[in-house]
A protein has these predicted regions:
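A generic structural motif
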Residues: 90, 115-117
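A generic "binding-loop/recognition-motif" signal
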Residues: 75, 94, 110-111, 120, ...
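Glycine- and acidic-residue-biased ligand/ion/polar-headgroup-sensing regions
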Residues: 75-87, 92
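Conserved short histidine dyad/triad with adjacent acidic residue
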Residues: 39-45, 57-73
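A short, N-terminal "cap"/entry segment at the start of jelly-roll beta-barrel domains
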Residues: 1-55, 144-164
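Short acidic-glycine-tyrosine-enriched beta hairpin
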Residues: 93-111
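Double-stranded beta-helix
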Residues: 117-164
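Hydrophobic small-molecule pocket/channel-lining residues, especially in calycin-type beta-barrels
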Residues: 66-67, 73, 87, 113, ...
Length: 164
């Protein structure tokens, strides 16, 4: 059996000496944003912190806290890793229960959704690659109620969110 190994990408750090540039975000840090619906967003590594490589977020969803229905993104992939609780995950065909340790990868254009339907909290890691300014998306939901239909459509397109 022969294993085909793709090449590594070109070097991005080319200095002769290493640098001290790592940073740590503690698990007990307060959320970066708490939505009125009871969703806590922890911005673990956003677009600015990763130079656009990816965005990684821990999302803690209240019991029966819902979530987005089927949608897709044109500019980025998205991945979900269930940390705790039960999340309903939509893979473009079926809604399935995702439990601790389950993983869903969605390439650009892939239909997906997620939600917490049970009476227990759930927590997931969400990864977007390349990174995008998702913080404005998460924090902007409160303004949707005051928008016209056209403004709402434009807002979702601006945030690379296309409903199915």
């Amino acid at each position: 059996v022969s294993l085909v190994v793709p090449p590594y990408p070109p070097a991005r750090y080319t200095a002769d000496e290493p640098e001290v540039s790592a940073w740590l975000k503690r698990a007990d840090a307060p959320p970066d944003y708490q939505s009125p619906a009871g969703v806590s967003y922890h911005y673990l590594a956003n677009q600015q912190a990763t130079d656009g490589d990816y965005g990684l977020y821990r999302v803690d969803i209240a019991p029966a806290g819902g979530g987005p229905g089927p949608h897709f993104h044109r500019a980025m992939s998205e991945a979900f890793f269930v940390l705790s609780g039960t999340m309903r995950l939509y893979d473009g065909t079926d809604w399935v229960d995702g439990h601790q340790g389950d993983f869903l990868y969605v390439p650009p254009g892939g239909v997906h959704g997620f939600r917490n339907e049970v009476e227990e909290p759930a927590s997931i890691l969400m990864l977007f690659a390349p990174g995008a300014p998702r913080e404005a998306y998460f924090e902007g939901f409160g303004a949707l109620a005051d928008m016209t239909d056209d403004e709402r459509r434009e807002w979702f397109v601006r945030h690379d969110n296309y409903w199915v």
